[in-house]
Amino acid sequence: MNDGTDAYLRQVREIALRVLAPYPVTVYLFGSRAAGGGRRLSDVDIAVESHGALPRHLLPELREALEESTVPYHVDVVDLGAVDPDFRERVRKEAIIWSGSRIG
């Protein structure tokens, strides 16, 4: 079943990469969409892992750009630097890397 989901995921990826392009980050798609089990109304989970200092406004700016887009799904943006280490490792192992490289 492809109800346009692939196009919307491409749009989420393009927005994230555009906003985050100047910064040393790795962007991941994780959760049900990455595992291929997402349902029609499932949200989209992306994680951002910084490999240097980021401006405080950056992730709120990314969230705003995603909210203002035509993507009909809620997009959760997770800062991997602010989560439990076990969760961070699970994302690193199970997610799809959209940009950057694994460090650490």
Model-assigned labels for residue ranges:
Residues 45-47:
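Short, well-ordered beta-strand segments
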Residues 1-28, 34-40, 49-104:
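Catalytic core of pol beta-like nucleotidyltransferases
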